[in-house]
Structures are given as C-alpha cells and as structure tokens.
Amino acid sequence: MGERRGTALLAALGSTALAGLCAALFAVSAPAAEGDLLPDLGMAPIADVKVAKTTDGRRLLRFTAVIVNVGRGPFELHLRRASTSDPMAVSQRIYTSTGSREVSSAAGTVFGGDGHNHWHIVDLENSELIRLDNGAKVGTGVKLGFCFLDNTKYRLTLPGAPSSPRYGTCLTAGTQTWLDVELGLSVGWGDEYRWSLPDQYVDITNLTAGRYRLRVTADTHNLFVESNDTNNATWVDLQIKGQGSVRIDGYGPAA
C-alpha cells in the first residue's frame, strides 16, 4: 500500500497547488545581498541502494538520500495564509550579519498525502534514473513532498553549525488547520530520507538490465536563495542485473 502513496500525494496537491508548481518551474530566486548568511543546499552520498520486489510484481530501486546545508546560514522557510481556505504562501527567511529578512518563493506546498499528517514543501529534492549508454532519463523518484528538519549530523565543523538540532521535529509542520508553519535545516545538518520510507524509490519494473546513473538534486528548480547552485546534485552509477540485483560502480561528488 505504501508504494502507491505518490499518486495520493499528487491528488492532494489539487489544481491550485499544481498551478503554483508549474509557475515555480520558471521561478528565479531573489538576489542575494551583501552581508547575507546564505544556506548552501546539497546532497550527502547516496546510500542503501537496493532493489525491492512488491507483492504485485513490481521492482523498486530504493535508496537513502540526505539533503544537507553546508552554507553560512540556516535554510528556513515559512508557510503562511490568512485562513484555512487559502493556499499557503512560502517565504524564505535569510539571516544577515545584523538580523534577518524574508523573500517570497514560488515553491508549492501540500498537506499529507504520503501518510504523514503535516505540511510539506513540494520538490525540495528530485531523483532521476538515467541510462549511461545514451543519456535517456528512464525513471523519476515518486516522493514529491518534504518536511525537512535537522535529523542527521553532517558537518558540524562549519562556522555557525549548532551542536544540537535547531529544527528538530515535523510536529511544527502543523495540522491542516494551521495558518503559520516553519521548516528549517541548520548549517552543518542534514535531513535523511531512508530507503524504507513510503515513496522513497524509483520504479524500475520495465527496465532492462544495464548500467544506469541515479542522480539526486536539491532545489532542482532554483526556488530558493543559496550561496552556490553548482553543488546541488550527487549521483551513484550502478548496474541493474537480470535477476533484479544491483551493483554499485561508483559515486559522484557530494556537498
């Protein structure tokens, strides 16, 4: 049942959120200003790559992904609306040397849809499977919504990295009636999505044996202000074998 929750999440988006998401594909993040302590989103090395078979005969390429912040300041988003009948508007709080400011973002939001009853940001990260022989994209990750928080220590030696979680629970992502929600990722911390979670997979049922690249990218559509947009992706090259097993051939750079 869990494997089909991606469809439920799409349905939960609704026409208003989908329209906002389409507009977001063409969004350009607000320019940075001098003195901004910007986040820098990226991905830790992909882990736990494996093929799982479902009871209805599908093959799922499962993996663990960790989005990380290696910048100078927190990655903090606020979701707000005037009433429960309004869609959430997203803004990013940017910390500075003297305080903070907020800039609007075209990021989409959705409540629930993946078995977790809280608010999510749509397309915070994306995964895709690519054939290495011809570069064709043959699969995409099912997971669409993300409630991110500090749950994985990544690089606490970075200046400004807290020793304990600052954004520690998705309980602050609220219920469906909330009007104001805060999500965040501290400097030096990551948010892990384990291979066993619902929707954390690419469906490879109809793929032939061969060599592929699994690529995971943070902020694919440039919806957020960062200090560096060139280090958002990581990948793993792998060989899918005829019996449904997988062999790792190599890893791309991580943040």
Feature locations, PLM:
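A short tyrosine-centered beta-strand micro-motif
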Residues: 207-218
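C-terminal region of N-terminal signal peptides and the immediate post-cleavage residues
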Residues: 21-35
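Exoplasmic/lumenal beta-rich domain surfaces
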Residues: 124-125, 131-206, 246-255
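N-terminal export and membrane-targeting signals
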Residues: 1-17
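Beta-sandwich strand segments
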Residues: 35-39, 73-78, 135-140, 193-195, ...
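Short amphipathic, basic-aromatic surface patches that mediate peripheral association
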Residues: 59, 63-118, 131-133
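Boundary/junction segments of secreted and surface-exposed precursor proteins
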Residues: 33-67, 71-76, 245-252
